[in-house]
């Protein structure tokens, strides 16, 4: 009994250490370097793209754009109060989970900033892994999507998620992980949210 009790904390600590090391693994580092090199050589440095990507990154702060889209979707359906209320509550729960509990498991440093930035940008102090913007974007897209409008929601999600690597607030792997987490959580939350905000239309 005591032996089991003594080994359990060690196993949990080993698991936690392995999870914490994942973002710093050589394979992840190579992926991040390749993605950043691609962005630097072929994407960054264009004024129009700077405006789009910095704007998208700012729009994703505190899920502002997703709350606005939830209000618009609720107005369109005739369920403004329930759609806005349930979606906002779901986004708050997702943010608490990802930006609180999940990020605490990793504590990854953010990419080194290269100043001056072409446009102003809010710089968070939380862990870099995973990207909260990417997670909330794909979470909200999963909840709000409809058969006719899903391409618009996911296009917005991809743009906001990608913008975080573009502006060097996140590593590319942070964005991929955040998008995956948000997509899974969104699919799990969708029946709960849509059960009270309107019919769940198939894609």
Regions found by a protein language model. Give the residues of each.
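N-terminal transmembrane-helix/juxtamembrane module of multi-pass inner/ER membrane proteins
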Residues: 2-64, 99-127
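Small-polar-interrupted transmembrane alpha-helices in polytopic inner-membrane proteins
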Residues: 89-105, 151-164
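Alpha-helical membrane-inserting segments
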Residues: 72, 93, 97-102, 106, ...
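Interfacial segments of alpha-helical transmembrane regions
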Residues: 72-97
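Membrane-helix interface segments
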Residues: 46-49, 79-83, 112, 147-152
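Alpha-helical transmembrane segments of integral membrane proteins
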Residues: 53, 82-90, 149-152, 173-177
């Amino acid at each position: 009994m005591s032996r089991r009790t003594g080994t359990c904390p060690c196993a949990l600590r080993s698991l936690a250490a392995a999870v914490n090391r994942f973002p710093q693994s050589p394979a992840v580092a190579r992926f991040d370097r390749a993605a950043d090199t691609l962005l630097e050589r072929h994407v960054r440095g264009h004024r129009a793209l700077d405006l789009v990507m910095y704007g998208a990154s700012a729009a994703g702060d505190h899920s502002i754009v997703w709350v606005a889209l939830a209000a618009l979707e609720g107005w369109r359906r005739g369920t403004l109060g329930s759609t806005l209320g349930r979606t906002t509550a779901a986004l708050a729960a997702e943010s608490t989970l990802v930006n609180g509990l999940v990020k605490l498991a990793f504590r990854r440093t953010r990419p080194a900033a290269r100043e001056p930035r072409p446009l102003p940008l809010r710089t968070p102090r939380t862990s870099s892994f995973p990207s909260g913007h990417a997670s909330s974007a794909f979470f909200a897209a999963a909840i709000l999507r409809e058969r006719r409008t899903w391409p618009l929601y996911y296009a917005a999600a991809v743009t906001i998620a990608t913008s975080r690597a573009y502006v060097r607030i996140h590593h590319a792997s942070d964005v991929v992980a955040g998008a995956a987490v948000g997509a899974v959580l969104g699919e799990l939350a969708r029946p709960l949210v849509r059960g009270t905000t309107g019919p769940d239309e198939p894609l």
